[in-house]
């Protein structure tokens, strides 16, 4: 006997994961508040029909109506799971008997009194398949049924049930089981069956079942039927379920984290050599990206049951989530999702999978905001890895220090020609902009990276208006958290309490700092020797300019870039159409 039939619940207490339905039904039964029509809705295989039979059993129990049937009376025995049934409980499959003639026959039979039970119960399964004429034939008897008659409608699409019928029922929505509840159910059944199942098999079975207890038990039944020595191994489950080996997923994610094209396409080759479906691999890769995003956003996602994986796999996934930024993972998921849509019905899914991998490796091939954020994130990571810890620099002698510091202090009166009580002008802010950026860098390196390409445009009341050539970065800079960082940096550098707003536009002609020529002349007069800090700053500014450039080299067609990468990495040859 199939597992889902063998372990079918016999009472509301045995129904798993539907407490929001079984609890109010039990209270209503014990209190004697019985309605003449019920509507059970929800996804397939979540217990609607089984609960309808339990409700009929509870209503007709000799000690009922009760939420806990005795199980020994004639009605309880006949309505037990896998029992022959009762003459007073009629099940109608509306998928094959949903016409007006079938419902008229049911209506005529409904007026007869029950033979040996308290109620005559009609269970209409797949109720959404009943035609409009059939529902109209039932409408009058559902509105004003005899006292002994109860209808129970079960459907996966309650919106297709006639509204006049639906409004006269008590509607109970069923739902799918969460992974943690499903895993406990599977472990209990495997223990009762005396079968040992590897821990890595449970996530595969739960994912294949899609949260439906019936479908999940069917998958588990298939694995138990083919298990040798009552032991279900991870390797056997992979072969039977057609799931991609987690090692191949790890290889692909590690290659993406390292931007290693050869390793990524090598993983694709292993997928094809192993006989895996490219579409299934793309689906499993998308699910991995989802798990990494959740782990990065919710560190305790595993303990909450949001991410279901073995402990060793969770350690690898946490390491991968730490190596790849959130913006990069989001773009990876978007690209793979779009690729899955292109693979649907494709005759060459492998080629499309390789093109998707090429897009993953080339964020510059797209001008979308997610690709721009990924490029900024990459440059920020490079900055964190390349900038060493600050080292102590030996101080120059007093004689050498005098000619350096003295010219630098002379231009200061130029910045404040007005009385000290007045606030700085736009020109003063432009001249002090490098200092402001240094203050921003101390608070948020991400915000400072996004300032590359931003210029000071104007000062409106107490609001400093910036202009950025990139619309996505302008929106990011205008967000509250980034605007607060800029306001605090301005307060430290200039002693002002200003708000900051960033707009999109071309840099103003007057964006160059006022008094810049004097500063340059002073720098030339001093002519200090290049230091490690100045070289480091030059490298920083170069990378930041690369991140924030508004008008990069002309965009290339993403398909052309992907094909070029395939030619360079795999030696592919392009075949033009005849």
From Swiss-Prot:
- Name the chain's protein: DNA polymerase III subunit gamma/tau
Q: State the Gene Ontology BP annotations.
A: DNA-templated DNA replication
Which Pfam family is an annotated match for this chain, by its short name?
DNA_pol3_gamma3
Q: What cellular component GO annotations does this protein have?
A: DNA polymerase III complex
Q: Which cysteines are joined by disulfide bonds?
A: none
Q: What does this protein do?
A: DNA polymerase III is a complex, multichain enzyme responsible for most of the replicative synthesis in bacteria. This DNA polymerase also exhibits 3' to 5' exonuclease activity.
The record lists ATP as bound by 42-49
Domain of life, per UniProt, equals Bacteria
Q: Where is the composition biased (Basic and acidic residues)?
A: 402-412, 536-559
Q: What is catalysed by this protein?
A: DNA(n) + a 2'-deoxyribonucleoside 5'-triphosphate = DNA(n+1) + diphosphate
**NCBIfam families noted in UniProt:** dnaX_nterm, PRK07764.1-6, PRK14952.1
Molecular function (Gene Ontology), one example: metal ion binding
- Organism, scientific name: Mycobacterium tuberculosis (strain ATCC 25618 / H37Rv)
Q: What else is known?
A: Was identified as a high-confidence drug target.
Keyword annotations from UniProtKB, A to Z: ATP-binding, DNA replication, DNA-directed DNA polymerase, Metal-binding, Nucleotide-binding, Nucleotidyltransferase, Transferase, Zinc
């Amino acid at each position: 006997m199939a597992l889902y039939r063998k372990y079918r619940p016999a009472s509301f207490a045995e129904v798993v994961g539907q407490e929001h339905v079984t609890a109010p039904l039990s209270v209503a039964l014990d209190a004697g508040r019985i309605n003449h029509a019920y509507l059970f809705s929800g996804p397939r295989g979540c217990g609607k029909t089984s609960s309808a039979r339990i409700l009929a059993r509870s209503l007709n129990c000799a000690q009922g109506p009760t939420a806990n049937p005795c199980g020994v009376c004639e009605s309880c025995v006949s309505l037990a799971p896998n029992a022959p049934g009762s003459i007073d409980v009629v099940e109608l499959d509306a998928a094959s008997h949903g016409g007006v003639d079938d419902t008229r026959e049911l209506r005529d039979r409904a007026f007869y009194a029950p033979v040996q039970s308290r109620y005559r119960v009609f269970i209409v399964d797949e109720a959404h398949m009943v035609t409009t004429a059939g529902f109209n034939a039932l409408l009058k008897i559902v509105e004003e049924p005899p006292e002994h008659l109860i209808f129970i409608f079960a459907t996966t699409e309650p919106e297709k049930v006639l509204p006049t019928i639906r409004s006269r029922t008590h509607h109970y929505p069923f739902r799918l089981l969460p992974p943690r509840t499903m895993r406990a159910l599977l472990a209990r059944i495997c223990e009762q069956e005396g079968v040992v199942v590897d821990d890595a098999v449970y996530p595969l079975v739960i994912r294949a079942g899609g949260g439906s207890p019936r479908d999940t038990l069917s998958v588990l039944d298939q694995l138990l039927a083919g298990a040798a020595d009552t032991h279900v191994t991870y390797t056997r489950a992979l072969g039977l379920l057609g799931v991609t080996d987690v090692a191949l997923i790890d290889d692909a994610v590690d290659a993406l984290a390292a931007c290693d094209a050869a390793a990524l396409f090598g993983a694709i080759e292993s997928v094809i050599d192993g006989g895996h479906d490219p579409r299934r691999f793309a689906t499993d890769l998308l699910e991995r990206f989802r798990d990494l995003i959740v782990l990065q956003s919710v560190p305790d996602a595993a303990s909450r049951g949001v991410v279901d994986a073995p402990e060793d796999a969770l350690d690898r996934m946490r390491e991968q989530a730490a190596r790849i930024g959130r913006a990069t993972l989001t773009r990876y998921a978007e690209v793979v999702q779009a690729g899955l849509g292109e693979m649907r019905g494709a005759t060459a899914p492998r080629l499309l999978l390789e093109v998707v991998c090429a897009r993953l490796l080339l964020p510059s091939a797209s001008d979308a905001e997610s690709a721009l954020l990924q490029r900024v994130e990459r440059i920020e990571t490079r900055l964190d890895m390349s900038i060493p810890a600050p080292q102590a620099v030996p101080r120059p002698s007093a004689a050498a220090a005098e000619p350096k510091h003295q010219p630098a202090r002379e231009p200061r009166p130029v910045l404040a020609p007005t009385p000290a009580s007045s606030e700085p002008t736009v020109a003063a802010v432009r001249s002090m902009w490098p200092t402001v950026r240094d203050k921003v860098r101390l608070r948020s390196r991400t915000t400072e990276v996004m300032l590359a390409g931003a210029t000071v445009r104007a000062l409106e009341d107490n609001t400093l208006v910036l202009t950025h050539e990139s619309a996505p970065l302008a929106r990011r800079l205008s967000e509250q958290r980034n605007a607060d960082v800029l306001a605090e940096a301005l307060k430290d550098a200039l002693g002002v309490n200003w708000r900051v707003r960033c707009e999109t536009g071309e840099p103003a002609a007057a964006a160059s700092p006022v008094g810049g020529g004097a500063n340059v002349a002073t720098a030339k007069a001093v002519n200090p020797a290049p230091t490690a800090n100045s070289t480091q700053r030059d490298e920083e500014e170069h990378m930041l300019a690369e991140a924030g450039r508004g008008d990069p080299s002309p965009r290339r067609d993403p398909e052309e870039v992907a094909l070029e990468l395939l030619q360079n990495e795999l030696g592919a040859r392009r075949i033009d159409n005849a």
